[in-house]
Amino acid sequence: MKCLWISLLLVLGGLNVACSDTSEEAVSIFAASSLIEVLPDLLSSYEEESGVDITIVYGGSNHLGAQIKDGAPIDLYLTADIELLDPRIERVDELIFASNYITLAVPVGSEKNISSITDLTRVGLDIAVCAKEVPCGKAAEELGVVIAADTYEPSVRSVISRLTLGEVDLGVVYATDTISEPRITSVWPENPMCPCVDYHGVSFTSRGSEIAVHLVSEESREILTQYGFLSP
C-alpha cells in the first residue's frame, strides 16, 4: 500500500488501523485481525490500479460487527464469522474468499513436550485461547476437549503476542499465524483439518463489491496460498 501505518485504538477494544495516503476516493474496510499480514499484499495491486485511498480497521469480528450495527460507514467487511453480523443490515453482496483452520502453537524452542490436542487439558501449562465471542475462540470450543485455559484473549493477535513474549506455553491460533510469525511453531495438527473458519467479504457499496471480487481473483488466490490460507 502507498503509505501504510498501524496504530492501536484502545477505546475500540484493540482495533488496528492501517491507511494509505490521501487520494480522490476514500474506501473503508473492516477486517478480521487474522488478515492483518496478508491483506496489504492482497490490496496493493488493486489500490495502485484504481487510485483509491484504502483505510483498513483490524479487530475481532465481534467488535467490528458491533461497529457496523452502530452505523459505522464502511464499504467492505471481511469477517471470520458471518454470524456475528446482524442479518438485518442491508448489504450489496456477499462471498467467501478464503478458509483457515486452527492449530496448537508454541514458542520456537519450547521444551514443554507439547504435541497433541490432549495437551490442552494438561495441568501445569500456561494456555491462551481466544474468548468464545470471537471466531478463533468459537473454533477452539469445537475441538471437543475442555481446555485448561489460563487466559481468554479478545483476538488471535493477542494470543500470538502472549506466545511470542513467552507469557504462555501453548496457544490456539490459526495455521496461517504460524507461517507469518517466525517466533511460534505449530505442533498439531500435521495436516489441515477442521474446526475451520470461512472468511466472508460483505460489501455495502459498489466499490466494496468490486474489491471483494478482486479477493477471489487468481492473483489473490496465489497470495492467499502463500500465506497458508485454503480455498473456500
Which functions belong to the PLM regions below?
Residues 53-62:
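A short beta-strand-loop structural module common to alpha/beta enzyme folds
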Residues 2-8:
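Sec-dependent signal peptide recognition
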Residues 19-49, 62, 66-70, 79-232:
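Exported/periplasmic ABC-transporter solute-binding proteins
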